[in-house]
Amino acid sequence: MKKFMVLYMASPADFEKAMKASPDQHKKGMDAWMKCTSKHKKSLVDGGGPLGKTKRVDAKGASNTKNGVGGYSIVQAQSHDAAAKMFGKDHPHLQMMPGAWIEIVEIMPMPDIVT
């Protein structure tokens, strides 16, 4: 089986708006998320979680930045297409924020390093 990193994406404005959801809306979203997680339990390697503030580090140092990544999971599947099929248009992340999207990136195996 191959492993894939799943990135739950949206604009920073959409994430800020989602954070203002009512307790009832939040519970409804979490219930849908847990149902989806249970459905794909056998494929879930790491349930991941929400992500916070971002630091960008380059040759000049570290600075605050924003990006569209709100959370992650790691799944396993036979193929990239099979992994993508786990995250259809009815996925809770896509339902909670109409402008949201999900990116699925294959995690490549690390070559053995000979010393």
Give the location of each predicted region.
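Conserved, structured core segments of small domains
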Residues: 1-115
